[in-house]
Amino acid sequence: MNREEVTDLIVTQKVKKKLTWAQLAEVVGHSKEWSTAALLGQMTLTEAQAKAIGTTLDLPEEAVTQLQVVPYKGSLPTAVPTDPLIYRFYELISVYGTTFKSLIHEEFGDGIMSAIDFNMDLTREADPKGDRVRITMSGKFLPYKTY
């Protein structure tokens, strides 16, 4: 059983058991954002976390073991995404990526925002014109070194 098959099984069991990502995050013991990334194959669970998820979702031992293996991160297809929601993020980076880069460099200097030392929070924001999605990302600034 590979990581993609484990992810498919997790999603199937989540739907079958009528669980939310937030409920599964409580089992994992981390934020819903990090836990969802882990359960979708992008992070590594500890043995205790993997066993707890395995019990909650009735996963086979092989899947529980696979959840403890460091995944190949960023393993989404490299083509332009076709899923409408994921494409909007692609579009957002295409339009605002140079703005993010310019403003971060102006504020912090030459470097990058870490996706390793990173936090994310996703919430619903009530709006009379239609609810909005609020995503807050916080990554440590890592300056490039000269040598």
Curated annotation (Swiss-Prot):
| Catalysis: reaction(s) | cyanate + hydrogencarbonate + 3 H(+) = NH4(+) + 2 CO2
Instruction: Look up the record and give one Gene Ontology term from the biological process aspect.
Output: cyanate metabolic process
Q: Which SMART domains match?
A: Cyanate_lyase
The Swiss-Prot or TrEMBL record annotates one GO molecular function as:
cyanate hydratase activity
- Identify which residues the record assigns to the active site: R88, E91, S114
Listed EC numbers? 4.2.1.104
Keywords, A to Z, come to: Lyase
Which family, according to UniProt?
Answer: Belongs to the cyanase family.
Please explain the role this protein plays, according to its UniProt record: Catalyzes the reaction of cyanate with bicarbonate to produce ammonia and carbon dioxide.
User: What's the protein here called?
Assistant: Cyanate hydratase
This chain's source organism reads Dechloromonas aromatica (strain RCB)
